[in-house]
From Swiss-Prot:
One of its GO terms (molecular function) is hydrolase activity. It comes from Mycobacterium tuberculosis (strain ATCC 25618 / H37Rv). The keyword Hydrolase applies. The gene is lipQ. Its EC number is 3.1.1.-. Keywords: Hydrolase, Virulence. This is Esterase LipQ. It catalyses: hexadecanoate ester + H2O = an aliphatic alcohol + hexadecanoate + H(+). It holds the Pfam family BD-FAE.
Length: 421
């Protein structure tokens, strides 16, 4: 009986791997086409694009998707490695540094579910965090939020049992891709799956990309998406007064910039009066200072100059400074949880360390930083023990911020029962 059960799970895992592999192959094909377009204009970008491809589309992604469908408990057994233990310790320390040793008592989610880590007294003992898979309700994918066609579409992830009277907190996911390639799928699935399970609504967006567009079109679209969410998310059960944002790589740059430049009319042409503030940000392995070439991959500055900014840094340093989130740090910044891999070959972790330090120096009230040992760029794409631990830690961070907003209430209301009027 046990053998039959394992065989069945492995069979389902194989089918899932094929499906995910087909999707990833399609994404990689689109990426290669975009990369070819980039390289046509600048052979010097070969190293940058090749490195990005190897980081964003590794074979382990497909394997991780497959393993995630077999048995979360089985996967958990592999989490006792030194690297997983170190990641657990660092994530825990980052949250303790931000909120104190009893931070788990402050976590609150719409389901009222206590964090898995709190119940099991440690991230390594997680009994279950869902594998990366999309959770859409009817008519919640490819929704237009702006006039940009395919580049202005978003997906809404939500629980199917979310009651009409509910107002769930919202997390916006901004995809990475060197400001030039990739889209709203298949990034951040471990995190969004977890947040949806906890009763949140997640919104994954596309945005305009280079070389077809020039900076600041990218951030304008992200802010347009925030404005759309604030105006419309209540129709899908979301709370327009509690919006948070995340993203990886270029998406982290855009998420951080959006979080720090709320309601800046220069970045909101045509919708200057829209409220684009967010309540928290959790950027992964991002670029936060576009003026510091010493803290970049050697090919990043020429890449930015040629494809994204369409201007040389020496000719227009103000443009690069204005595009850098580190230029916008201030004492009223929303809470930040900054994450980076120690061995990131594409974006040095020094970018995140300097950014976190700048936030603290500016007087920002809540800044948490976790640098994960042995983690590379795009470490969260695969459904590994580490990516799931990171998702759980981010959910705890956002849960504390949400708990503050809700008056740090304990207990819960049933997700399927709207609040009493």
């Amino acid at each position: 009986m046990h053998i039959a059960s394992v065989t069945s799970r492995c069979s389902r895992a194989g089918a899932e791997a094929l499906r995910q592999g087909a999707q990833l192959a399609a994404d990689a094909r689109d990426t290669c086409r975009a990369g070819a377009l980039l390289l046509r204009g600048s052979p010097c970008a070969i190293g940058w694009v090749a490195g990005w491809l190897s980081a964003e589309f590794p074979a382990r992604v497909v394997t991780g998707h497959a393993l995630s469908r077999i048995s979360p408990r089985s996967i958990g057994r592999f989490g006792t490695s030194w690297a997983a233990q170190r990641a657990d310790q660092i994530l825990h320390a980052a949250l303790v540094d931000a909120f104190g040793p009893d931070f788990r008592d402050l976590v609150w989610h719409p389901t009222g579910e206590q964090s898995e880590a709190a119940r099991r007294s440690g991230l390594l003992n997680l009994p279950h965090i869902p594998g990366p898979h999309r959770r859409y309700a009817a008519q919640t994918s490819d929704i237009p939020y702006g006039p940009g066609g395919r580049e202005n579409l978003l997906d809404i992830w939500r629980r199917p049992d979310l009651a009409p009277g509910r107002r769930a907190p919202v997390l916006i996911q901004v995809p990475g891709g060197a400001w030039t390639i990739n889209g709203k799928r298949p990034q951040a699935y471990p995190l969004m799956s977890r947040m949806v399970e906890l009763g949140w609504i997640c919104v994954s967006i596309n945005y305009s990309k280079s070389p077809r567009c020039t900076w600041p079109a990218h951030i304008v679209d992200v802010k347009r998406a925030i404005a759309w969410v604030r105006e419309n998310i209540a129709d899908y059960g979301g709370d327009p007064d509690f919006i948070t944002i995340t993203g990886g790589s270029a998406g982290a740059h855009l998420a951080a910039l959006a979080a720090l430049s709320a309601n800046d009319p220069a970045l909101q042409p045509g919708f200057e009066s829209a409220d684009t503030a967010v309540q928290a940000a959790a950027p992964y392995y991002g670029v936060y200072d576009l003026t510091n070439a010493e803290n970049m991959h050697e090919m990043m500055m020429p890449f930015l100059e040629h494809f994204v900014m369409r201007s040389r840094y020496v000719d227009n340093p103000g443009l690069f400074k204005a595009a850098s989130p580190i230029s916008y740090v201030h004492s009223e910044a929303p809470p930040f949880f900054v994450l980076h891999g120690e061995k990131d070959p594409m974006v040095p972790s020094a970018q995140s360390r300097a950014f976190s330090a700048a936030l603290r120096d500016a007087g920002a009230a809540t800044v948490s930083y976790a640098e994960l040992p042995n983690a590379h760029h795009a470490f969260d794409l695969a459904a590994t023990v580490r990516s799931r631990m990171v998702a759980e830690a981010v959910s705890d961070f956002l849960g504390v911020i949400y708990g503050r907003r809700m008056g740090a209430r304990k207990g819960s209301l049933a997700l399927s029962s709207p609040p009493a009027s």
